[in-house]
Every structure is written in C-alpha cells, then in structure tokens.
Amino acid sequence: MFRLVYTASSKFKYIAQTLAKINDEGVFEFSLDGLRAWIMSPDKTSLAILEMPSLSFEEYMVEEEMRVVLRTDELNKISKRATRNDDIIFQWNAEEQALEVELRDRKLGFSRKFLVPATSVGAEEMRRLKLEPTVSFTILTDDLKAMIQDVKVVGDFAEFEASEGQVVVRSQAEEKEYEWVMKPGDVLLSLEVEEDAKSIYSRQVLEIATKPVGAAESVKVSFASDYPMKIEYTFPNGERMELYMAPSLAG
C-alpha cells in the first residue's frame, strides 16, 4: 500500500527517540502528501505531532491512505541500528499487518529488515490543537538544552516569565536557586510578547524537548500564563515536530 525511502537515518534517530520518550505507541498516518504521527503521553501531560512531507523522502509512494497504531519503542530500537550510510525504507506488509522497516546500506548494498506489528489498523483521525499563546521566542537548540540541564541541577520545575524585551527562566528548591534572563540579541533569536505571561512546567516533561536538538539548529517556544507550552522544531528538509507540554500546578 505504501513505500517510503528516507535517507536521513541520523535525523530519524532523534525523531524516533523523542516519540518513544512520550509513549510506547502512537498513531501514524500515511497520506498522499506525507507521513504524520500523533503521540500522547499516558498521563496526557505531553503530546508530539510529527509531520514529514512527501518531499522530505527520496521516494514516496502511497496507493491508499491509512492510519495505524505502531510501537514507537520498537521504531526507536530499529533506528538505533541504522548507520549514517543506511537508507530507511518503510513498507506495509499486508499479510503480517505490520510495518516493514528496511535498513539498506547505500555503499555496500546489503539490507536488514525488521517488522513492527500494528497494534491496530484504521485508527481515529488525528486532531490538531488550536492554541492562542501570548508569547513566542526562538532560541538555539543548544541553548534550550543547556537551560533544561541547568534546571535539572536545581529543581523539578521551571517557571517561565515573559515581559516586553525579555524571558526569565527560574527554578528553586531546598535553598537552591536558578535564573536565566534571556533577551533578543543575547540568547533569543526573536521574541514576540502580546501580553505578559508566567507559567510553570515540569522539568521532567521539558526534558523531552532536548531529544531532537541534534537534528535542528533552532527551536520556537510559545506559551501563555498557566497555559500549555508549544515547542516547535523545523528540520532542514521540511520535516516538523511540535511538542506540547501541559503547565504544572506545583512548583
């Protein structure tokens, strides 16, 4: 029913790792214009939406659109077996009702094949979130990762407070405190503030956002007061990943 050839195996490792971190399984949609995935954590505090347009694949052939539930943990294990010389080929095995993942070495020509059985076929249509954040900023992925690692040293929660001209990230616990004041031209690549905002997020949930950093240079972060945070990655070939983090009432 479909055959997809993806040449950026190193990038897919970051993608698969992120999806598996949120949940062991998720909905995958193979449509005429691209591959999409929708993964929500069991406690509903985090959500990942992946979009890989057909042009991001070397070969993209879908005869009939379909949605299936697949094990993201199995995809993650398989992606770890890929080398930088491997193409990743996705095909649907109708007889086994499974996703066939082939790792084909471009230089040597040999292949390794794996099967990921579908938990279910014909899953519900994926829903998109409609949020209205009041703050958006862009930051280098390395700086985002450093920030979250800093917070981990201090506490379990991070407070984000934005006002005109700056975003301040704070954390505190057991007589330890952390604060990072970020401004455009300093750390922030861009900043838009429609309304001052303050919200707290779990550090454990935020750590999920560090998984794709090796595949993108910058990331867009959006939030509002006591409102879900959206973290958006755009990769070089048009792939996109949106991560949504629920605010925390603790902290």
Curated annotation (Swiss-Prot):
CDD domains: PCNA
InterPro entries linked: DNA_clamp_sf, Pr_cel_nuc_antig, Pr_cel_nuc_antig_CS, Pr_cel_nuc_antig_N
Domain of life from the UniProt record: Archaea
GO MF entries: DNA binding; DNA polymerase processivity factor activity
Keywords for this protein: DNA replication, DNA-binding
Pfam families documented for this protein: PCNA_N
GO terms, biological process: leading strand elongation; regulation of DNA replication
Function: Sliding clamp subunit that acts as a moving platform for DNA processing. Responsible for tethering the catalytic subunit of DNA polymerase and other proteins to DNA during high-speed replication.
Subunit structure: Heterotrimer. The subunits circularize to form a toroid; DNA passes through its center. Replication factor C (RFC) is required to load the toroid on the DNA.
Protein family (similarity comment): Belongs to the PCNA family.
Name of the protein in its database record: DNA polymerase sliding clamp 2
Gene that produces this protein: pcn2
